[in-house]
């Protein structure tokens, strides 16, 4: 196994998804992350990329701010990422005050 994330803590990273950009072979991972949490269950969304076949990984938090999910609303399966010709499109759900919202970002390597 190869470690993808940069986290040295014992916090949770979960519901990971990944894709390979067929145009250049770059690897792209997306997951929920609690490594920077200031309160219990505070969650961010992290994108990790490798442009050298998995020898090195670069990590970036892409959520605008952390959120704290509630046990009453399931949100985890609704996360995905696509990559085509250096254009990366992650999609995820976050919860704010018990309301789910769908988010995306426009990430470009070119």
Where does each model-flagged region fall?
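Extracellular, repeat-based ectodomains that mediate carbohydrate processing or recognition
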Residues: 1-110
């Amino acid at each position: 196994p190869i470690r993808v994330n940069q986290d040295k803590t014992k916090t949770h990273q979960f519901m990971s998804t990944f894709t390979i950009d067929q145009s250049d072979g770059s690897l792209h991972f997306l997951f929920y992350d609690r490594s920077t949490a200031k309160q219990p269950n505070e969650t961010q969304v992290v994108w990790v990329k490798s442009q050298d076949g998995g020898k090195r990984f670069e990590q970036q938090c892409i959520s605008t701010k952390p959120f704290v999910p509630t046990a009453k609303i399931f949100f985890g399966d609704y996360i995905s990422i696509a990559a085509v010709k250096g254009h990366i499109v992650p999609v995820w759900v976050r919860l704010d005050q018990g309301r789910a919202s769908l988010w995306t970002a426009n990430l470009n390597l070119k």
